[in-house]
């Protein structure tokens, strides 16, 4: 994450956006949604392994999909309504 160019999104905003839409959780499902053109916005956890987040961030840039960072995997998991942390999630069409 390049903190000079990226903004950490408030978890309340993430929760609200995900509650209003369909979404996928996890790197594999998210990459599939990006490649199929279904992802509207991607959420990545700042404390997730860069081996997971960096390829997804690159795909977001390639497919011109908005990317938002969330402070932690626990926060992102909570926003998705799951009991474990999540490295990545996406609002989909």
Annotate each predicted stretch with a short phrase:
Residues 2-38:
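Ribosome large-subunit tunnel/peptidyl-transferase-proximal elements
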Residues 29, 40, 80, 84:
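Short, flexible micro-motifs
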Residues 26-27, 52, 72:
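Amphipathic coiled-coil/heptad-repeat helices and related helical stalk/stem segments
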């Amino acid at each position: 994450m390049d903190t000079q160019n990226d903004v950490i999104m408030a978890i309340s905003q993430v929760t609200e956006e995900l509650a209003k839409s369909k979404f996928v959780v996890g790197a594999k499902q998210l990459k599939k949604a990006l490649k199929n053109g279904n992802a509207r916005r991607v959420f990545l956890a700042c404390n997730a392994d860069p081996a997971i987040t960096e390829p997804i961030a690159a795909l977001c840039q390639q497919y011109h999909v908005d990317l938002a960072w969330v402070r932690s995997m626990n926060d992102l998991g909570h926003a998705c309504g799951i009991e474990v942390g999540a490295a990545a999630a996406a609002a989909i069409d």
